[in-house]
């Protein structure tokens, strides 16, 4: 057992310790930046210095640092985070690694994201649930393309708190001029991003300088150490203040006397007696009960998985939305969205894709690519396609009406994934900017031969369960 946890349990008792842990605020943050900027080392050092590393892990770390470490005689703290064999062999991060730690003040979930450009899609996945981003910059190399790319994607995904950690200051002798130059360059770039709270701190992740306490080696730095910034960062409560929204994940029908609608509350608070509207149908009813495994609730908050029963029998199925009558959720078949493209084959207009928005799955196609965004300069360029890791603003038409919110309003009902219809692989991630009126996705066009061949297959080989493409 971790010695810090053991001491706390001994002092408080197990029940009080668990109760105190339960009521601590939780901050989700990610580390991002270019390859070899020290993201995994930073997290490993934070875990170590906050006394969250178990004794057996520490012994393994000493052993692994001698065998495959990249830091000479010093402990390679990145090995605490990089778990894949390929990551350890190459000294890089590939997948998104999640780690948990806590301090007396707050709990934290960290997403350690990869720095290599080909893993940008993994970074976008890690950023999608975070409240804060730590942008790592190597003091020797300054602001690089991936630094800008990750900053832009984090901003695009709604993160409005950045801590810019200028790492490896020990390799530039903790030179204040180097720090000031990097700070100036980054803030000039970030001026083109949406309004963001940005703090800059000089650190040495390997040696632990300015992580938990202020370093004597940077007397010219008057700000807080990194961990204090994390403890004092604002935790998003915006969804709590919004009107209620919940995507229906499943209709629960265990017997003839019960019909409930299961899902996770995306925004707002709901109580028995509240009026809710069903989208896209627009029908209204009152909440009868809020059911959970542990019994009925008096109210449900964002993030809670519940089953809601209604006073009236209404046709509701998976993918529908339950919302408060005053929610500004739009029902549409046409959206404007920012999209991060995640596959080698370029995104092309007019090609049919599967679209999954919250719990609703539908089909659609790209009507137009309004522009592609240069992540280095934030300039907008004309484009006819999006390549791997490129970001663009697109108009999409859907075959079915869906309820959507702008991503900056509600993440869960404003984000979607694009799925390849043949391979079923996720190939893009989208953030809704706004609902557009007037267009719907038309039927897919097939030649006469394709229609006849499809009919022949369905007639003579019904066990293949081929779709009727004339209805697509």
Curated annotation (Swiss-Prot):
Main EC class the enzyme belongs to: transferase
Region listing for G4, in residue ranges: 167-170
Region spans: G5: 204-206
EC number: 2.7.7.4
Catalytic activity field: sulfate + ATP + H(+) = adenosine 5'-phosphosulfate + diphosphate
Spans traversing the lipid bilayer: none
Keyword ATP-binding among UniProt keywords: yes
Name recorded for this polypeptide: Sulfate adenylyltransferase subunit 1
Native species: Tolumonas auensis (strain DSM 9187 / NBRC 110442 / TA 4)
């Amino acid at each position: 057992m971790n010695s810090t946890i053991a001491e706390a349990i001994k002092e408080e008792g197990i029940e009080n310790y668990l109760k105190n842990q339960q009521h601590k605020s939780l901050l989700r943050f990610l580390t991002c930046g270019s390859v070899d900027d020290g993201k995994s080392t930073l997290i490993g050092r934070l875990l170590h210095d906050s006394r969250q590393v178990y004794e057996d892990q520490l012994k393994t770390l000493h052993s692994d640092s001698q065998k495959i470490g990249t830091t000479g005689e010093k402990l390679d703290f990145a090995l605490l985070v990089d778990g894949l064999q390929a990551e350890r062999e190459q000294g890089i991060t590939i997948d998104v690694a999640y780690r948990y730690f806590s301090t007396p003040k707050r709990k934290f979930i960290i997403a350690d994201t990869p720095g290599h450009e080909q893993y940008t899609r993994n970074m976008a996945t890690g950023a999608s649930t975070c409240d804060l981003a730590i942008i790592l910059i190597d003091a020797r190399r300054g602001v690089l393309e991936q630094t800008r790319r990750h900053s832009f994607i984090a901003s695009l995904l709604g993160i409005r708190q950045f801590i810019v950690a200028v790492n490896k200051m020990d390799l530039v002798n903790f030179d204040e001029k180097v720090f000031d130059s990097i700070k100036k360059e980054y803030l000039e770039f970030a001026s083109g991003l949406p309004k963001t709270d940005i703090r800059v701190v000089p650190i040495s992740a390997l040696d632990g300088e300015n992580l938990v306490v202020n370093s004597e080696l940077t007397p010219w730095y008057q700000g807080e150490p990194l961990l204090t910034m994390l403890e004092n960062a604002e935790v998003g409560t915006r969804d709590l203040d919004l009107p209620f929204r919940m995507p229906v994940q499943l209709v629960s029908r265990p017997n003839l006397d019960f019909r409930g609608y299961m899902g996770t509350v995306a925004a707002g608070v709901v109580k028995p007696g509240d009026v809710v509207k069903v989208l896209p149908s627009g029908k209204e009813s009152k909440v009868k009960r809020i059911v959970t495994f542990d019994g009925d609730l008096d109210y449900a908050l964002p993030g809670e998985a519940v089953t809601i029963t209604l006073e009236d029998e209404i046709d509701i199925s998976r993918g529908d939305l339950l919302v408060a009558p005053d929610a500004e959720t739009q029902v549409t078949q046409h959206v404007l969205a920012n999209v991060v493209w995640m596959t080698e084959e370029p995104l092309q207009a007019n090609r049919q894709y599967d679209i999954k928005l919250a719990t609703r799955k539908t089909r659609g196609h790209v009507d137009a690519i309004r522009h592609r965004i240069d992540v280095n300069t934030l300039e907008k360029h004309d484009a006819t396609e999006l390549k791997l890791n490129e970001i663009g603003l697109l108009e999409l038409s859907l075959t079915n009406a869906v309820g959507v919110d702008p991503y900056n309003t509600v993440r869960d009902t404003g984000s979607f994934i694009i799925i390849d219809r043949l391979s079923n692989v996720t190939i893009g991630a989208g953030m809704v900017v706004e609902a557009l009126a007037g267009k719907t996705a038309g039927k897919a066009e097939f030649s006469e031969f394709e229609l006849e061949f499809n009919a022949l297959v369905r007639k003579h080989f019904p066990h293949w369960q081929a779709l009727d493409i004339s209805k697509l």
